[in-house]
């Protein structure tokens, strides 16, 4: 058993059994210890203390790599002990708190590290349960990966005081990422039972992990059920700033039913989807004047390889902004 210190305001340690997993894809405690130390040194340590961790000859990280190369458990334990003592000293003298106070947005590697810790402890051991979906229905499971999601947050300008909603939120990855990376109020709705159960496990672990890392995330809300019928989701959509809909595998019927909900969304709300709700050649005309899609101004964007879980290749996504001005202008032009 090895204890690795977190950089928060309490006496929190993560406990690790130094075992080698049978399967190469299973959780590797030694790798996680190294990654925790790497992440802490990059995000929590003031510049004037960085050399103790980063020095290429004598730094904690270099000594840790040397211990691994020597396959020496005693050497490894000694380095982790020195790391723990350094973190405790910096925590007590206020250096870590000062560093955190100057950080206004978490960088993506830290976000990914925390999300990976959560996922590996909750979803990974039970991932087989997610394979029980039906092709050709709306209940096909697939994940948008953290780097792609971070790009979406930047493209939409999502801010901490805003509201994010993920319709079809699966195991809750994106809901948690929005609350962690942006610090905003974050909602998700999912109807697949297995995914919902894993999402709730992730949410519990998320709260514990944020405490360990000394981070105050936005509030998360995970709702079980049909997002077209759940009243809490219908209500939050009216005040949402950014809505994510991974509609890659949705049936045309569900996509059409979703469109009617756009009427109640506020001006300026941005809807991000993998399939556009507005046909490419669509124009506002007198015969389609009452169509909800006339309220949407759409821009197309590209995502690159390794952005989604179901394919390695890139693709396109769409950001639709609710903007009634074009419809008003057309109506006025008709007299």
UniProtKB/Swiss-Prot annotation:
EC number: 2.1.1.360
Class in the EC hierarchy, top level: transferase
SUPFAM superfamilies reported in the protein's UniProt record: S-adenosyl-L-methionine-dependent methyltransferases
Keyword Nucleus in annotation: yes
Subcellular location(s) per record: Nucleus
Regulation: Ubiquitination of histone H2B to form H2BK123ub1 is required for efficient DOT1 methyltransferase activity on histone H3.
Residues at which S-adenosyl-L-methionine binds: 141-144, 164-173, 190, 226-227
Family matches, as InterPro entries: Dot1, DOT1_dom, H3-K79_meTrfase, SAM-dependent_MTases_sf
Keywords linked to the UniProt accession: Chromatin regulator, Methyltransferase, Nucleus, Repeat, S-adenosyl-L-methionine, Transcription, Transcription regulation, Transferase
Pfam families: DOT1
Signal peptide: none
One Gene Ontology molecular-function label: histone H3K79 trimethyltransferase activity
Family: Belongs to the class I-like SAM-binding methyltransferase superfamily. DOT1 family.
Name the record gives this protein: Histone-lysine N-methyltransferase, H3 lysine-79 specific
Organism field: Aspergillus oryzae (strain ATCC 42149 / RIB 40) (Yellow koji mold)
Source taxonomy: Eukaryota, Fungi, Dikarya, Ascomycota, Pezizomycotina
Gene: dot1
């Amino acid at each position: 058993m090895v204890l690795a210190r977190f950089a928060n305001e309490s006496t929190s340690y993560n406990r690790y059994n130094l075992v080698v997993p049978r399967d190469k894809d299973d959780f590797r405690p030694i790798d996680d210890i190294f990654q925790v130390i790497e992440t802490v040194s990059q995000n929590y340590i003031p510049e004037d203390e960085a050399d103790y961790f980063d020095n290429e000859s004598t730094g904690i990280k270099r000594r840790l790599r040397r211990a691994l190369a020597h396959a020496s458990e005693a050497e490894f334990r000694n380095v982790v002990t020195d790391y723990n003592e350094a973190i405790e000293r910096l925590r007590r003298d206020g250096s870590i708190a000062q560093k955190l106070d100057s950080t206004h947005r978490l960088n993506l590697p830290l976000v990914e590290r925390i999300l990976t810790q959560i996922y590996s402890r909750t979803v990974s051991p039970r991932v087989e349960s997610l394979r029980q979906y039906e092709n050709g229905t709306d209940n096909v499971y697939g994940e948008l990966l953290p780097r792609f999601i971070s790009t979406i947050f930047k493209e939409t300008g999502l801010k901490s005081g805003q509201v994010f909603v993920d319709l079809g939120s699966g195991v809750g990855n994106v809901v948690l990422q929005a609350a962690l990376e942006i610090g905003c109020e974050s909602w998700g709705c999912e109807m697949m039972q297995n995914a919902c159960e894993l999402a709730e496990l992730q949410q519990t672990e998320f709260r514990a992990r944020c405490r360990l890392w000394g981070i105050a995330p936005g509030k998360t809300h995970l709702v079980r059920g049909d997002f077209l019928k759940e009243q809490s989701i219908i209500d939050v959509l009216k005040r949402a700033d950014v809505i994510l809909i991974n509609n890659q595998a949705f049936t045309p019927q569900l996509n059409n039913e979703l469109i009617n909900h756009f009427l109640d969304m506020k001006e300026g709300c941005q809807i991000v989807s993998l399939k556009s709700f507005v046909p490419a050649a669509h124009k506002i005309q007198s015969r389609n004047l009452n169509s909800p899609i006339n309220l949407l101004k759409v821009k197309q964007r590209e995502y690159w390889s390794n952005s989604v879980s179901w394919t390695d290749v890139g693709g396109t996504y769409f950001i639709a902004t609710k903007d009634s001005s074009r419809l008003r202008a057309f109506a006025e032009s008709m007299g």
